[in-house]
């Protein structure tokens, strides 16, 4: 199509009849293009963005959505004004005003925006096809969506141009009407919120914020709108009226679109709380709960089918305009159709094949985000052209509207900058989902998204500082034309008319120069859609000559000067003889139009007609540009569970029972929790609490026998073992949650008991046992010596060569047959520095493990009186001397004896040991040195395998080989006093290598006095096996009763069960949502515990791989193995019975959160079971006072050790416990949640006439309401106390 045909093209949606200049026909001409453009804002991606924002953040983003809607109205209005005034599209003006590289970049952005719109349209039709015909094959749906929208244009191609334009307008209007009225009328139950809610922004909401921005404003629509209306040229008297018509049309249509978005957000917010929907099926099912009329989803799908035709048409128009003017490529419309479909169907098929329904949902949101990324740089040319006096003349935007455009640009730019900063430096849940850390399929690489965001922001800043080519000459033009001469002021009216006539001819040539290269003639009905011309244009343009004289005679003399873009080019253009095809252009049309521009551009005070567009926004509130992050880390080394799954190496593989990818049948997958995951969650919680409470919240018989009532504070009876207390002893607290805070002095008997003869060996055991802590860094050894696993790995060769040197501590007899398994009982404290220096000096030069001789062990502050210490010291020295120990051994023994233990703990593997082997029923394990059990286990397997491969030679094995052998003995022997080692071919059944092995134990059934501990074997330190109670107050006998053991055993098993339950919860797909809620100190504590457990689980397997352990246990066995030893960092450790109470509060809140959005009666029943059992935790959680929780070293140290695997040194961890953020969950908070659940569940209903609607839903509601009523009754009574 040549320049004449380009000027005469009109909107394909213009369906008005003859236009004589009245207001109504002008309105129809403006309404057609607006309807055509608005269909692009009602596709599936926009709908999903609104529902997702409302389901996750409620009404927090409604005000910002309103601002985005105003921005869309402003942009579309300016685009219509540009096309109407200049008669050119925005792409054509950009081609003239910007350099070629800039135009190409703008064209790439517009093309990407077109592609994302086409992609969302294909997905919308495909999913609509599947839902309408109940067909599950997405590939077939995509093929259907690719072919069907192209059939209608060819079906109506035989119709006339005017009929095609009218039909397009009717289709667009019908689709928009069904979309708006269908969704507004179909759901009267949800009240619309009229209160203005100030936006509550955070890093988590940046994702939904960008999706809403891209859903409300699209960059390619600017070019399409200006191109569609560019043929609607009117006289100066009609331009102002057209402006009002365009404003009214855009405002009317986009107001309806915003109402629909607001209804969707409000409905999703009322029916869901903090929900992340992952599939379109989830969205449809959620909407089924909201809408009363079951026809609403069907109407929406029909709208998608009708709108696909309009979107396909506008995409082809936009592609043609963009490619012709910004790229300089001329293709027919059919070619643009094929190109768009080809580029859109490839990612659609790939996403459907690889990612499924969940991936399609994520891609729909990402498409909206990409649209938002392209906006800041795309609106700069629009705003610059609209405010340019040289281009728009008298119709440039007003100052107030120019300020609004500037604020709109800042809002878009700040939104992109915040999103980019969150992607680069944030740790939000949606970012982990984009990176694939949550187990969700990665449909779009996050690195590509970050790159697009950074490039878009940089290009936006470049465009902001780059003026138009005509703007760069504005000063020169103003200097040339703004100062009128005195001669012009004295000219007569005839002279002024002659001047105007000259300018008419000049402007005619100049306007001809503006017309770009001819356009390609469209084919068939696509041609008719673009070339439809209203018959009324001839009548309007026939009066132009008479309007010229009126315009010229009523203006000042100087107002006849014509503006030019480049004066040098204008002079040359005047002398050019135009070719013949351009002559038919009406000179009267161009001359009149150019004269009006020259008149109004130089005399703003004397205009023919002054029409100021009304302001589009009644408020100029600037959106905040600072997002307040709610998920701040609690410390530099304490990652929060809000980081979902962390790096990819920390992502857990789901268990056998989980069903990843269950997207098509799941309702609202709460941040990845699908239907199967929610079912598994309920089963896990029911299993754990089923060991404690029955379905009435009463303690089970098994739990009562294990004293769980005392542990949890359900029964305040004093244990029978505490009845025999001396009058001088302190009163024993009745609740074990208070007993957890007792110091080591409570474990020591009185001096009378310590000096008794029959307890000398027991006291000696006690002296040596009290030195051992239970967690890393809890004792002096952990503060003085901490070796990371990388050090052990890098210096394993040096340790193998130097290990034998550590065997010279004691001059005790050894056996030549098995001396490779001999291990010294201990390393003297005063010899430690020399040993470290010697190892450091003789180590392998390739070793990177520095042994710091300055880190000497420091004695812990003793909590017992000095008199007791002196008595113990004297008695132990006498006993050691009587057993034949050397003075150096006695000195080392006394030094170790002064080290106090913070707390002790029973190892479950020994608690459930075989009592027939002759051991006591209960035995303790004391842990002091750093937890390197995983390293010992790894080195054991590797070295033993090496030993076997080497022919089983015993005498040549090194120190770590003996450690591995004894580690095997420790892990495979269960409380046997003289049990043979696991590797009989390597070691005889009995090893008398210790200095006390020659002395008979006073208790024949006791285990070996110098049994090696896994944490001590690396340093050669042995610990005593105590047979005394941990809780032994002053004044009591040194003996131990079974009640004391029962208490500690019960606490151990309870905490082990809790730890195993958390580990299973972490393996649920999408478990990140469970551990990133901000609900107070209980939830924060459980979140941090879960984070540490996750790192420890992965750290165990990583250490085995790091040290070359080829025989790795299965996942479940590995978890059980590493959980045999619970962490314990002292009296402030969180691993105590009160942690179970916090976990109970956490479970109540999670189950209520799930019940708030659950719509399946089967899961209602499972939640009811869990809530029934959790009634038992209400008393200790809400009736009794609880002390403030502190983040102990267990929540920090383990993370630091795991994170230091690749460093050469590790700083000792002695952090001060800090308070857990937030306060305890109160009964009133739970009552509010229960009210919300009751309201949400009462509105759920199934389809009438079905078993689900008539039986399952009512019964499920009844059961859930029953347990919630019991909760309300019990919590209400507790709140009044």
Swiss-Prot record:
Disruption phenotype: Mutant etiolated seedlings display insensitivite ethylene-response in roots and coleoptiles. Mature mutant plants have reduced shoot length, increased number of panicles and reduced grain yield. Residues 540-565, 593-665 are annotated as: Disordered. It is found in: Membrane. Residues 548-557 have a biased composition (Polar residues). Expressed in roots, leaf sheaths, leaf blades, flowers, developing seeds, germinating seeds and young seedlings. Expressed in adventitious roots, vascular tissues of the seminal roots, lateral roots, the connecting region between vascular tissues and lateral roots, mature leaf, mature stem, tips of adventitious roots derived from the node, shoot apex, young panicle, anthers, pistil, stigma, ovary, seed coat and fruit coat pericarp. It comes from the Eukaryota. Keywords: Ethylene signaling pathway, Membrane, Transmembrane, Transmembrane helix. One of its GO terms (molecular function) is manganese ion transmembrane transporter activity. GO terms for biological process: ethylene-activated signaling pathway; iron ion transmembrane transport; manganese ion transport; regulation of ethylene-activated signaling pathway. Residues 599-610 have a biased composition (Basic and acidic residues). Residues 43-61, 134-137, 185-208, 260-297, 347-362, 422-447 are extracellular. The chain crosses the membrane at residues 22-42, 62-82, 113-133, 138-158, 164-184, 209-229, 239-259, 298-318, 326-346, 363-383, 401-421, 448-468. GO terms for cellular component: plasma membrane. Residues 1-21, 83-112, 159-163, 230-238, 319-325, 384-400, 469-1281 are cytoplasmic. Belongs to the NRAMP (TC 2.A.55) family. Central factor in ethylene signaling pathways that control development, senescence and grain size. Acts as a positive component of the ethylene-signaling pathway. Plants silencing EIN2 display a stunted phenotype with severe inhibition of shoot elongation and produce high levels of ethylene. 'Mao huzi' means cat whiskers in Chinese. This is Protein ETHYLENE-INSENSITIVE 2.
């Amino acid at each position: 199509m040549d320049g004449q045909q380009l000027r005469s093209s009109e909107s394909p949606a213009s369906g008005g009849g003859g236009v004589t200049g009245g207001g109504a026909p002008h309105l129809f001409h403006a309404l057609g293009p607006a309807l055509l453009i608005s269909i692009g804002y009602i596709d599936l991606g926009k709908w999903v963005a609104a529902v997702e924002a409302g389901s996750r953040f409620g009404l927090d983003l409604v005000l910002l959505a309103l601002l985005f809607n105003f921005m869309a109205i402003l942009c579309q209005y300016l685009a219509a004004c540009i096309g109407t005034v200049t008669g050119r599209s925005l792409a054509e003006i950009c081609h003239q005003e910007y350099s070629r590289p800039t135009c190409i970049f703008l064209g790439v952005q517009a093309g990407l925006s077109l592609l994302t719109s086409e992609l969302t349209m294909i997905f919308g039709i495909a999913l609509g096809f599947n839902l309408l015909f109940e067909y599950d094959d997405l590939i077939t749906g995509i093929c259907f969506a690719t072919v069907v929208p192209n059939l209608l244009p060819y079906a109506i191609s035989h119709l006339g141009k005017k009929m095609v334009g009218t039909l397009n307008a009717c289709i667009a209007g019908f689709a928009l009407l069904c979309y708006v009225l269908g969704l507004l009328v179909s759901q009267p139950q949800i009240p619309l919120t009229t209160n203005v809610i100030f936006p509550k922004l955070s890093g988590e909401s940046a994702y939904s914020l960008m999706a809403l921005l891209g859903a409300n404003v699209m960059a390619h629509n600017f070019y399409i709108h200006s191109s569609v209306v560019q043929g609607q040229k009117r006289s100066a008297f009609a331009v102002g009226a057209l402006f009002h018509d365009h404003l009214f049309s855009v405002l009317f249509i986009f107001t309806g679109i915003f109402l629909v978005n607001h209804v969707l957000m409000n409905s999703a917010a009322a029916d869901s709380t903090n929900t992340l929907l992952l599939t379109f099926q989830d969205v449809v099912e959620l909407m089924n709960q909201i809408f009363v009329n079951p026809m609403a989803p069907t109407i929406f799908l029909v709208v998608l089918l009708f709108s696909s035709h309009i979107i396909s048409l506008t995409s082809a128009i936009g592609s043609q305009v963009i490619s012709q003017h910004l790229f300089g490529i001329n293709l027919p419309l059919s070619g643009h159709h094929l190109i768009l479909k080809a580029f859109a169907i490839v990612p659609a098929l790939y996403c459907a094949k690889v990612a499924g329904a969940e991936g399609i949902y994520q891609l729909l949101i990402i498409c909206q985000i990409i649209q938002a990324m392209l906006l800041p740089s795309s609106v700069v040319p629009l705003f610059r052209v609209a405010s340019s006096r040289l281009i728009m003349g008298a119709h440039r935007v007003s100052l107030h509207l120019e300020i609004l455009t500037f604020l709109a640009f800042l809002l878009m730019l700040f939104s992109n900058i915040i999103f980019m900063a969150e992607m680069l430096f944030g740790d939000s849940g949606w970012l982990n989902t984009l990176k694939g850390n949550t187990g969700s399929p990665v449909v779009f690489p996050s690195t590509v998204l970050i790159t697009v965001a950074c490039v878009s922001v940089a290009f936006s800043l470049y465009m902001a500082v780059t003026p138009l080519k005509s703007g760069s000459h504005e000063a020169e033009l103003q200097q040339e034309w703004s100062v009128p001469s005195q001669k012009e002021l004295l000219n007569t009216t005839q002279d002024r008319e002659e001047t105007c006539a000259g300018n008419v001819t000049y402007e005619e040539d100049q306007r001809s120069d503006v017309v770009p290269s001819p356009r390609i003639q469209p084919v068939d009905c696509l041609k008719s859609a673009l070339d439809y011309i209203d018959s009324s244009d001839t009548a309007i343009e026939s009066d132009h000559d008479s309007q010229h004289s009126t315009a010229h005679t009523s203006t000042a003399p100087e107002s006849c000067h014509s503006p030019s873009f480049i004066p040098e080019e204008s002079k040359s253009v005047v002398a050019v003889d135009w070719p013949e095809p351009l002559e038919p252009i009406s000179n009267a049309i161009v001359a009149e139009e150019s004269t009006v521009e020259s008149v109004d551009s130089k005399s703003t005070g004397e205009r023919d007609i002054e029409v100021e567009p009304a302001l589009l926004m009644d408020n100029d509130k600037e959106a905040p540009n600072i997002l307040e992050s709610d998920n701040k880390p609690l410390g530099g080394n304490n990652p929060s569970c809000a980081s979902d799954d962390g790096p990819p190496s920390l992502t857990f593989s789901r268990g056998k029972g989980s069903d990843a990818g269950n997207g098509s049948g799941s309702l609202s997958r709460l941040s990845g929790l699908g239907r199967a995951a929610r079912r598994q969650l309920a089963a896990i919680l029911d299993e754990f609490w089923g060991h404690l409470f029955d379905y009435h919240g009463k303690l089970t018989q098994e739990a009562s026998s294990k004293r769980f009532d005392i542990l949890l504070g359900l029964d305040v009876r004093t244990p029978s073992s505490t009845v025999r207390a001396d009058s001088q002893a302190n009163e024993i607290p009745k609740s074990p949650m208070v007993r957890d805070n007792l110091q080591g002095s409570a474990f020591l008997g009185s001096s009378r008991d310590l000096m008794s003869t029959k307890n000398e060996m027991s006291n000696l055991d006690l002296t040596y046992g009290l030195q051992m802590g239970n967690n890393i860094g809890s004792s002096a050894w952990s503060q003085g010596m901490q070796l990371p696993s990388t050090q052990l790995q890098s210096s394993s060769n040096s340790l193998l060569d130097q290990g034998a040197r550590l065997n010279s501590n004691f001059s005790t007899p050894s056996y030549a047959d098995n001396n490779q398994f001999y291990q010294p009982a201990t390393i003297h404290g005063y010899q430690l520095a020399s040993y470290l220096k010697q190892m450091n000096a003789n180590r392998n030069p390739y070793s990177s493990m520095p042994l710091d001789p300055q880190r000497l062990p420091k004695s812990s502050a003793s909590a017992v009186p000095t008199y007791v210490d002196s008595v113990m010291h004297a008695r132990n020295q006498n006993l050691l001397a009587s057993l034949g120990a050397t003075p150096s051994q006695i000195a080392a023994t006394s030094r170790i004896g002064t080290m106090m233990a913070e707390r002790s703990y029973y190892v479950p593997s020994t608690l459930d040991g075989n009592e027939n082997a002759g051991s006591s029923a209960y035995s303790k394990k004391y842990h002091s040195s750093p937890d390197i059990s995983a390293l010992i286990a790894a080195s054991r397997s590797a070295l033993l395998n090496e030993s076997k491969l080497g022919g089983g030679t015993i005498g040549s094995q090194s120190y770590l080989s003996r450690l591995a052998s004894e580690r095997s003995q420790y892990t495979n022997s269960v409380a046997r006093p003289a049990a043979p080692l696991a590797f009989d071919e390597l070691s005889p059944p009995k090893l008398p290598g210790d200095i006390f092995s020659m002395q008979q134990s006073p208790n024949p059934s006791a285990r070996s006095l110098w049994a090696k501990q896994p944490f001590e074997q690396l340093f050669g330190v042995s610990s005593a096996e105590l047979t005394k109670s941990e809780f032994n107050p002053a004044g009591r006998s040194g003996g131990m009763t079974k009640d004391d053991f029962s208490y500690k055993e019960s606490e151990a098993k309870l905490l082990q069960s809790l730890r195993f339950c958390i580990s299973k919860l972490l393996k649920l797909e999408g478990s990140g949502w469970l551990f990133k809620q901000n609900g107070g100190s209980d939830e924060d504590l459980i979140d941090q515990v879960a984070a540490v457990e996750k790192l420890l689980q992965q750290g165990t397997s990583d250490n085995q791989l790091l040290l070359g352990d080829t025989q790795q246990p299965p996942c479940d066995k590995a978890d059980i193995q590493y959980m045999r030893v619970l962490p314990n960092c002292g009296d402030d450790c969180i691993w105590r019975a009160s942690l179970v109470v916090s976990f109970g509060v956490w479970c109540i809140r999670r189950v209520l959160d799930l019940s708030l959005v659950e719509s399946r009666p089967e899961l209602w029943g499972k939640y009811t079971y869990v809530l029934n059992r959790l009634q038992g935790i209400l008393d200790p959680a809400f009736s009794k006072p609880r002390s403030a929780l502190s983040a102990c070293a267990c929540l920090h140290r383990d993370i630091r050790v795991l994170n230091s695997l690749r460093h050469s040194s590790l700083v000792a961890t002695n952090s001060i416990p800090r308070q857990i953020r937030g306060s305890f969950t109160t009964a009133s908070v739970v009552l509010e949640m229960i009210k919300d659940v009751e309201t949400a569940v009462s509105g759920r209903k199934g389809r009438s006439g079905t078993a689900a609607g008539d039986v399952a839903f009512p019964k499920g509601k009844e059961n859930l309401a029953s347990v919630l009523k019991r909760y309300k009754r019990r919590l209400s009574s507790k709140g009044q106390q």
